[in-house]
C-alpha cells in the first residue's frame, strides 16, 4: 500500500464518523448508510424540446427499452404524444427518472407560458436535456438562459443525426458541419456551458457521434449521492465511466470492510478472526454488476466480436470470471469458498500495512485484523475486476471501433 493510499483511507474515516461508532456502538447502521444511501436518492432528468425532436426515443434508448410491448416504453411519434410531463423510471433504479416534457411552442404549451405552466414545474428537475433535431432556435436558447440564470444543470443535445448521415459518403465531415452549425447558434447565448452533443437514439454506438460522451456528461453534471445514483444505474460503460466507477467503488472499501468484520461474523477456519461472508459475497456481486463483468456481459461481448467466451477468456487473459463465483447463500459453504483466500490475505504484507495505517480502527474498535483482512481481500479482487472491465472495453474498441459498451 502506497502512502497516498494510506492517506486516502485515513481521510475516508472521518473523525465524526469514528466518534459515532465509538459512542453509539452502531457500526452496522453507519456502514450500511455509507454504502447504500445512493439507493434512496431521487434524480429527475427532464428532456425538453419541440414536438418531434426525439425526446421519447432518447428516453427509451438510455433505458434500453427497445419494444413497444414493454410496459414502460415511451410512446414515439412525429406528433405531440405528451400532454403532461411523464416520468419513466430507469429499470435498474426506479428513483432515476427520465421526464418526457410536453413539446415547446405547441398550442397548449406556448413558449411565453411554458415556464410558468403549473403542469410543467419547470424548475423542479435536477438535470435538463435541451434537445433539437435540426438547428437550435431562439426557443432552446431562451430556456437554456433561464436555466443558467437559476443555476440549473443543462445539456444541449442535437438528436436524430442518423437521418442527416443517411447516404452520406464522408460521415465525419457531415458530423463536423452539423456540430459547427449547432455551436454557432449556442454561442450567441449568454450561457456558460455551450457544448453540444450529437446523438442518434437508434445508433448509440455510432463512431462519429456523442452518445458515449453524453452518458459521461450526465454523470459529471451530477454531484454527491445523485452522482453515485446516476453512475451506478446507467447501463453503459465507457473508458471514463469505468475509471469513475473505480474511484467510487474504492471509496466504499472502508465501509464494506467494516461491515464484513462486524456484521453476523463467523470464525474463519484455522484463523483467529471472524468475517461476514455474506457481506463480502454481496459486495463482490455488486462489483461485477457495476463494472459489467457478469457472465451475461461476457456472452454479449462474445456475440458482438464473433468469438467464443472461452476464446475471449484465454486470448485476453480475463481473470475474474472463473474465481469467486457465488454458487450458494449457505454461510458454511460460503466460508469454504472464501477461507483459503482469506487465510492467504491474513498472512500477507498488505494486511500488516493496512493495520498499521489504520491504528485508530484497530485499537478503538477491537477487530482490526478482521477488518483489515476483509478490506484487503475486497480491494485485491476489486482491482482484478477493474482490470477485466478495462480489458473487455479494449476488446470492444479493438474489434468494433465502438466506444460504448452496454452492460446487463
Predicted features along the sequence, with ranges:
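AAA+ P-loop NTPase catalytic core and its hallmark functional loops
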Residues: 76, 97-113, 156-159, 164, ...
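Switch II of P-loop NTPase G domains
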Residues: 80-86, 96-148
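Alpha-helical membrane association modules
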Residues: 228, 232, 236-408
Amino acid at each position: 500500500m502506497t502512502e497516498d493510499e494510506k492517506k486516502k483511507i485515513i481521510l475516508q474515516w472521518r473523525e465524526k464518523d469514528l466518534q459515532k461508532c465509538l459512542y453509539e456502538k452502531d457500526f452496522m447502521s453507519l456502514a450500511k448508510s455509507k454504502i447504500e444511501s445512493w439507493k434512496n436518492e431521487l434524480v429527475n432528468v427532464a428532456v425538453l424540446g419541440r414536438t418531434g425532436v426525439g425526446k421519447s426515443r432518447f428516453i427509451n434508448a438510455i433505458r434500453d427499452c427497445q419494444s413497444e410491448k414493454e410496459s414502460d416504453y415511451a410512446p414515439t411519434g412525429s406528433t405531440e404524444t405528451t400532454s403532461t410531463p411523464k416520468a419513466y423510471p430507469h429499470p435498474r433504479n426506479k428513483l432515476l427518472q427520465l421526464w418526457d416534457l410536453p413539446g415547446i411552442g405547441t398550442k397548449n404549451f406556448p413558449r411565453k407560458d411554458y415556464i410558468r405552466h403549473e403542469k410543467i414545474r419547470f424548475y423542479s428537475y435536477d438535470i435538463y436535456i435541451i434537445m433539437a433535431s435540426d438547428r437550435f432556435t431562439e426557443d432552446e436558447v431562451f430556456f437554456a438562459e433561464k436555466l443558467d440564470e437559476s443555476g440549473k444543470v443543462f445539456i444541449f443535445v442535437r438528436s436524430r443525426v442518423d437521418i442527416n448521415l443517411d447516404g452520406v459518403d464522408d460521415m465525419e465531415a457531415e458530423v463536423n458541419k452539423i456540430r459547427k452549425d449547432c455551436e454557432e447558434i449556442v454561442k450567441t447565448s449568454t450561457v456558460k456551458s455551450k457544448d453540444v452533443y450529437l446523438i442518434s437514439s437508434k445508433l448509440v454506438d455510432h463512431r462519429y457521434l456523442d452518445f458515449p460522451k453524453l452518458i459521461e456528461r450526465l454523470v459529471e453534471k451530477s454531484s454527491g449521492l445523485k452522482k453515485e445514483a446516476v453512475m451506478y444505474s446507467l447501463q453503459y460503460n465507457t473508458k471514463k465511466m469505468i475509471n469513475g466507477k473505480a474511484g467510487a467503488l474504492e471509496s466504499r472499501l472502508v465501509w464494506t470492510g467494516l461491515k464484513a468484520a462486524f456484521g453476523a461474523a463467523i470464525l474463519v477456519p484455522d484463523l483467529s478472526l471472524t468475517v461476514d461472508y455474506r457481506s463480502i459475497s454481496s459486495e463482490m456481486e455488486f462489483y461485477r454488476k457495476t463494472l459489467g463483468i457478469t457472465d451475461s456481459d461476457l456472452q454479449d461481448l462474445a456475440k458482438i466480436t464473433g468469438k467464443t467466451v472461452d476464446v475471449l477468456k484465454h486470448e485476453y487473459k480475463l481473470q475474474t470470471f472463473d474465481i469467486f463465483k457465488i454458487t450458494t447463500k449457505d454461510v458454511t459453504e460460503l466460508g469454504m469458498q472464501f477461507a483459503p483466500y482469506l487465510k492467504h490475505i491474513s498472512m500477507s504484507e498488505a494486511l500488516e500495512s493496512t493495520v498499521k495505517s489504520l491504528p485508530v480502527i484497530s485499537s478503538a474498535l477491537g477487530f482490526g485484523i478482521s477488518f483489515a483482512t476483509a478490506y484487503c481481500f475486497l480491494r485485491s479482487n476489486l482491482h482484478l475486476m477493474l482490470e477485466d472491465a478495462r480489458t473487455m472495453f479494449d476488446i470492444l474498441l479493438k474489434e468494433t471501433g465502438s466506444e460504448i459498451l452496454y452492460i446487463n
